Amino acid sequence: MKDVESRVMAELFKNSRRSDRELAKQLRVSQPTVTRVRTRLEKEGIIREYTIIPDFSKLGFKLVSIVFGRLKEPVSQKTISDLRGHAAEMRALEQGNPSPTIVSMKGIGCEADYVSVAFHKTYSEYTQFIAYVRQFPHVKVDQIKSFLIDLQDRSHMRYLTLSVFADYLLRTKEDS
C-alpha cells in the first residue's frame, strides 16, 4: 500500500464521515488525490463499506455472543457455492435468525471449525439464536461453545473501535 493510501485509510479509520476536502486538508494533499485514492481503495475491495459503531446497549442489546462451533463433517466448497447461489433462500433463512450476526467464519482454534459473533436483546433471544445455528441447512453441528459479553457492564477494558488501526497502519508503514 502506498504512503498516501495508508494515510487516507488511517484517517478514515478515525472518522469515515469526513469529506474528501477535509481529508485532503488534514493530509496536505489535493482533494482530487484523496478522491482518486478512495475510489481505488473501494474498487479494489480494500474499503468494503462505511459504517458506524454505536453504543449497542443504547440500541437495546444486552448481550454479545461469540459462538464457537465444531462440525461433525466439513462443509464442502460445493455446498458453500450452492448456498451462495441461492441468495433468496439465504436471505429468507437469515430473516429467521433472531439476532443480528456480524461475522460468521470458518477458522481453526478453541476446538472449533467456525465462529459467529451476534448481538442479542435478551438471553432468550440468545438461546433462540443457538437453536437457529443448530438447524442451519447442510451443516451438521457437533458441538457449540459460547462466550457471552454483558453490554451493560461498564467495567469493560476497551469497547469496540476500529480507530486503533489508524496508528497501526501508519506504524507498520514506517517499519516496512
Where do the protein language model's features map onto the residues?
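A compositional/biophysical signature of low hydrophobicity enriched in polar/charged and small residues
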Residues: M1-S176
